[in-house]
């Protein structure tokens, strides 16, 4: 399954933001340890680099970007995706751009802490907890539950 990670999930992990860190870190681990393909829109790399360089340092920001490039699929974004994003009834343009990238790259879902912001998304959005609960149910042996 292809899943698009919202920027807030990665920031939860990178900045160890409580009370969100545990669930977001588990989502990231799950995505890396299973056959899921974790995706990230290209525009998120520059945002993450900027935030980490500002609040930590440039070396840590570079290390993070290198790690993301090695472990996640970075989805290219072009003009047509941004035009599509503008056509979506999503108030925040960054969220609309992420939804458009998810749609164009064949992602089946978006993982975000702000599900309400993605109600008009062409790709359904789930919280980390919802995703983990569904993933656990899928891996449960028959007769479990």
Residue ranges and their predicted role:
Residues 1-39, 53-60, 120, 132-145:
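Short, well-structured N-terminal submotif of metal-dependent ribonuclease cores
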Residues 9, 44, 81, 97-98, ...:
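Alpha-helix capping/helix-boundary segments
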Residues 34-35, 71, 88, 121:
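Structured helix-beta-strand junction loops
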Residues 40-42, 112:
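Short beta-strand segments at enzyme active-site cores
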Residues 2, 71, 100-145:
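Acidic, PIN/NYN-like endoribonuclease modules and their adjacent C-terminal/linker elements
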Residues 16, 42-44, 64-89:
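Acidic catalytic patch
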């Amino acid at each position: 399954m292809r899943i698009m990670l919202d920027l807030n999930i990665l920031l939860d992990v990178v900045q160890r933001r409580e009370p969100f860190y545990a669930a977001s870190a588990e989502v990231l681990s799950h995505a890396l340890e299973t056959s899921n393909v974790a995706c990230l829109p290209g525009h998120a790399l520059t945002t993450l680099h900027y935030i980490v360089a500002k609040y930590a340092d440039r070396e840590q920001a570079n290390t993070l970007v290198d790690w993301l490039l090695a472990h996640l699929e970075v989805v290219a974004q072009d003009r047509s995706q941004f035009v599509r994003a503008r056509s979506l009834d999503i108030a925040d343009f960054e969220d609309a751009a992420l939804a458009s990238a998810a749609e164009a790259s064949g992602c089946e879902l978006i993982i975000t802490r702000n599900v309400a912001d993605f109600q008009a998304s062409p790709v359904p959005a789930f919280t980390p907890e919802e995703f983990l609960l569904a993933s656990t149910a899928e891996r449960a042996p028959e007769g479990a539950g």
